[in-house]
Swiss-Prot record:
PANTHER family: COILED-COIL DOMAIN-CONTAINING PROTEIN 32. It comes from the Eukaryota. It is linked to Cardiofacioneurodevelopmental syndrome: An autosomal recessive disorder characterized by global developmental delay, feeding difficulties, microcephaly and dysmorphic features. Additional features include cleft lip, cleft palate, variable cardiac defects, and abdominal situs inversus with asplenia. Brain imaging reveals cerebellar hypoplasia. GO terms for cellular component: clathrin-coated pit. This is Coiled-coil domain-containing protein 32. InterPro entries: CCDC32 (IPR028039). Regulates clathrin-mediated endocytsois of cargos such as transferrin probably through the association and modulation of adaptor protein complex 2 (AP-2). Has a role in ciliogenesis. Required for proper cephalic and left/right axis development. The gene is CCDC32.
Length: 185
């Protein structure tokens, strides 16, 4: 490789001279093997010959260069890019399974709430039998226990009565506290 003159030199050269000197140091592209550095993608349309070309009856030889035309798959590629852009921007209109499940859960909740609020709805299922309020409450409790108030029987079952064993133990505790004080005196 050639050594360039230092920046201290007083002689000024034109840009063309500098480029000529730089390019002379580079290898000549015509000397290299073309097969090793060849670009592999040809950008040639994959459709068979004759489909995209205009056929001219008078000429036996058609020109090798075709006028520019979009590739067959360019519409698909553009559609995929537009889809990605919509997804990135948050404008995606496709319904995902997560959205479907959320919508169905909301609809189910609204249906149950509407059903449980209507007292006449239970009569449709009983078919003429007289149902009292306790039957409806029992049915509501079975469907949605968190929506129905706790009955007095359930409260009594949940809160155990205080046992008689705990009261004497509570009375013995102050007496036990007095004994160590008496022992210290």
């Amino acid at each position: 490789m050639k050594m360039f003159e230092s920046a201290d030199s007083t002689a000024t050269r034109s840009g063309q001279d500098l480029w000529a000197e730089i390019c002379s140091c580079l290898p000549n592209p015509e000397q290299e093997d073309g097969a090793n550095n060849a670009f592999s993608d040809s950008f040639v349309d994959s459709c068979p010959e004759g489909e995209g070309q205009r056929e001219v009856a008078d000429f036996a030889v058609q020109p090798a260069v075709k006028p520019w035309a979009p590739l067959q798959d360019s519409e698909v590629y553009l559609a995929s890019l537009e889809k990605k852009l919509r997804r990135i921007k948050g404008l995606n209109q496709e319904v995902t399974s997560k959205d479907m499940l959320r919508t169905l859960a909301q609809a189910k909740k609204e249906c149950w709430d509407r059903f449980l609020q209507e007292k006449l709805a239970s009569e449709f299922f009983v078919d003429g039998l007289d149902s009292d309020e306790s039957t409806l409450e029992h049915f509501k409790r079975w469907l949605q226990p968190d929506k129905v108030a706790v009955s007095t029987e359930e409260v009594q079952y949940l809160i155990p009565p205080e046992s008689q064993v705990e009261k004497p133990v509570a009375e013995d505790e102050p007496a036990a506290g007095d004994k160590p004080a008496a022992a210290e005196q």
